[in-house]
Amino acid sequence: MEAAAMAVTAATGALAPVLVKLAALLDDGECNLLEGSRSDAEFIRSELEAVHSLLTPNILGRMGDDDAACKDGLIAEVRELSYDLDDAVDDFLELNFEQRRSASPFGELKARVEERVSNRFSDWKLPAASLPPSSVHRRAGLPPPDAGLVGMHKRKEELIELLEQGSSDASRWRKRKPHVPLRIMGGEMQKIVFKIPMVDDKSRTKAMSLVASTVGVHSVAIAGDLRDEVVVVGDGIDSINLVSALRKKVGPAMFLEVSQAKEDVKEITAMLAPVKSICEFHEVKTICILGLPGGGKTTIARVLYHALGTQFQCRVFASISPSSSPSPNLTETLADIFAQAQLGVTDTLSTPYGGSGTGRALQQHLIDNISAFLLNKKYLIVIDDIWHWEEWEVIRKSIPKNDLGGRIIMTTRLNSIAEKCHTDDNDVFVYEVGDLDNNDAWSLSWGIATKSGAGNRIGTGEDNSCYDIVNMCYGMPLALIWLSSALVGEIEELGGAEVKKCRDLRHIEDGILDIPSLQPLAESLCLGYNHLPLYLRTLLLYCSAYHWSNRIERGRLVRRWIAEGFVSEEKEAEGYFGELINRGWITQHGDNNSYNYYEIHPVMLAFLRCKSKEYNFLTCLGLGSDTSTSASSPRLIRRLSLQGGYPVDCLSSMSMDVSHTCSLVVLGDVARPKGIPFYMFKRLRVLDLEDNKDIQDSHLQGICEQLSLRVRYLGLKGTRIRKLPQEMRKLKHLEILYVGSTRISELPQEIGELKHLRILDVRNTDITELPLQIRELQHLHTLDVRNTPISELPPQVGKLQNLKIMCVRSTGVRELPKEIGELNHLQTLDVRNTRVRELPWQAGQISQSLRVLAGDSGDGVRLPEGVCEALINGIPGATRAKCREVLSIAIIDRFGPPLVGIFKVPGSHMRIPKMIKDHFRVLSCLDIRLCHKLEDDDQKFLAEMPNLQTLVLRFEALPRQPITINGTGFQMLESFRVDSRVPRIAFHEDAMPNLKLLEFKFYAGPASNDAIGITNLKSLQKVVFRCSPWYKSDAPGISATIDVVKKEAEEHPNRPITLLINAGYKEISTESHGSSENIAGSSGIDTEPAQAQHDNLPAVRDDYKGKGILLDGRCPTCGRATKIEEETQDRVADIEIQTETTS
């Protein structure tokens, strides 16, 4: 809340940040403010601080219908004044020394404050929140009684089946399907069914001939009991023109069905269908109906309430009005439930209680009474519109679970509540109310139009506005009903011209808050909007910049929020974006395994545009916009969105004042974007030209020459630029540069002059290297170079002391510079899909904050903690330079992606290096490769390491004698991994007392039935075997060892012990190796047997001398593992060793 109080908001404008900026100006002795100007600034600051102190707790912290407050004349004046004051401060700071001495920047603003704020502030009171009667809240989402329940029958049957028969869907969640537009584009097979009164075969032949001659039609047939249906299958069919032609030449045709052809439908259904269990069938005792406002949640719940009511001894239908907290109406809701339950079956829905709760004692009394009354009864409880999880917890507590067939139905528009219900209760089935299909949506809209008698005047083909309404409403029943009704009211003004038609539809959209016939729809949307805190409303209103045909890119929107001053940190903004998803305002499509995209329902966008207009927050201009209205507005345009098809010449020809516009977003290819008069935008801070294909290098150079010096955000993603011009250096205040998906191949040296740059995003470009001037960007906290040909990062990245996020995903980078350890504020390092397998050990200095994304998964690897300070303080300066050759941090491992990075000693060694023993005793994890055995003194050193929790031992050659682990030391060790041809190891009594995980990676070798002794590992929980994919799991050395472990696992006191054996039994090579001869070495690289480098290392130690192997150090023939080949991690399957208990 403290951060939100200092941000730009839709209600208070730039009031909070401009007060901070004004205070800094007054405190800066080098600004050369004249005495008169200083006095003006101090007066303004004093007056506005008093206003801010009043508004902050009363507007920022409260929910509900505060439109009366935010639209109040004084608050509106303060809001506009804050923007002008912000501009005035920046205007003054751009002046040179001499100009400042003669400037009077605040004189006019002081007069405005005196006249319009100070004189009215003394007796001004904050307008009270005006909430409509609670009955309005309950009924706002219901369609009119005569609207008909089009499309509800299928939902009703599905829900009744769930309640009566249960579900075999193991996911317990029926997802809504993505909306398919009414017009199915070319290339996709579609099925269209028309109903036409055809009295004889002549009219049928005429209809079939007409349809068969239509472009895209593959087949046509007559169907229906009365042979009055025409079934058409094809691709790219213009269904609107076809139905218009049938009406003109055959008779009054109407749509019965518009869908994808059967083959495609089957495929899509299979893709969207949840995973179902084969044998299980679960009883469904509670259904959570989830959906958008106006989606039919309450309507279908009411239908179920009446359809099933006679099957239950008592039934309840209770609604909950939204509030800022769960407490105000909860007691009344409980009383309502109790009263209805006692009445038994009732035909009248409850009337909301308007009073407030009378304490927890009464609440608990009601809970106890409801629970006692329902305990022995078959009940149907419907709770409509849950807004707070705490509400549902209390209500759920009052409803007892019994075996008498009681059922509970709840509705909510909040994804977060549905997800928590799904997680917390296995009896809950989440049913997402999907959109009406195109057939039902068309029938509903066209039926309303024809019922009013306006069907003949509504237009045909492309001029049929019902077509536009169906596409805009995305199958939302309430929107279809009320927008179609509003269309009837506007029917006389419809014309044939395309632009006129768009303007009429735009007029209906823009009138959601004003047109009386749309009031029920507006009230339904207002419930969710007013339930948001102000900071979320501000972020949501900014989304009105999008057209309903646009998909929202999460990163792009989040970064614009930051540039606008609504949020300060990207992580915070990401959290807010997720909150808008949870509250149902932004819809996410896709899942964790596919591309995610986001959108806002077109009706919600229209509502947000109307709200934005009330605050003078953002102005949208697109095809069909009434430019005269925008030009004649008495308010200045603060933020402007130009949408596809808008003629930008209007900006120059109209009297529209954009000199105070701080944000310009151009969506899609507007007409002649290079003709946008950027010189008119004198105070622009945010410029987004992304995905505009007409922007090229020459245009960008001209744009940079015209741009305001105070631009903070420049979005050029998806444009056709090939280089960044030198003129960009003038953008001294640029904070976010987004040039991804362009054709640029280098960053200019001038990039170093952008001292305030915070985010640099060059993903999906042809950039091959970062310039050395990158070191000058001391404010940079996000560097994203993913999907570029960059193969090396310069050491200068270590100078970026404020860097928090570095992404080199899907690049050619193999190794990170050691200077990365100097990035003390780094929080996220993304090296997925690269050859980076290790980090320099210096990265351990930032382990407490750093999260590493490695491999090809999204699971983060935490770096080892608790040893950084000891490492730094315990290593002499002269020795520290050599440590890079001795130690690194492995983030990708042959055993699988570790959850915690492991300190790794590169290369192969005869013994544990002396430097490790002298300076790295404090390590919490260690991965080392030895040539053929673990010497006694080395084992003693490992056993006495005080913090060692994870140990990985790898052996180049097969140890001649088993390595014995006795009961001394290893007190902290929890994970032990052995990488050897065959695991020659034996655990004695009380060995490794806290070991929980034992893991083997092995290949092939002589069979042995020697005991391993896992029964002596008292804390053991899991044993994992990973066999090399080049050898069969039934090779003698492998199968014999597995058999030994299986037998010991059956005898372990902790049984059952989980045993994991790799499931990759299929041969990767046509040649398998089952003997101990000619076997691949167990190096860090899986190579084909013919390429093994160390297959025949002698087993006798003396023979190593002749092969260049140092007795007291590394084996130089192995080298440092910097060229580890990428490989797919072994898959493992669970095999639980079950033992029969003996009596």
From Swiss-Prot:
**Residue stretches in coiled coil:** none
Question: Which GO terms are recorded in the biological process aspect for this UniProt protein?
Answer: defense response; response to other organism
Outline the segment boundaries, as ranges, of region: HMA-like domain: 191-264
- Domain named HMA: which ranges? 189-258
UniProt LRR repeat ranges: 681-706, 708-731, 732-754, 756-777, 778-800, 802-823, 824-848, 945-968, 979-1002, 1004-1027
Q: What does this protein do?
A: Disease resistance (R) protein that specifically recognizes the AVR-Pik effector avirulence protein from M.oryzae. Resistance proteins guard the plant against pathogens that contain an appropriate avirulence protein via an indirect interaction with this avirulence protein. That triggers a defense system including the hypersensitive response, which restricts the pathogen growth.
Q: What is this protein called?
A: Disease resistance protein Piks-1
| UniProt source species | Oryza sativa subsp. japonica (Rice)
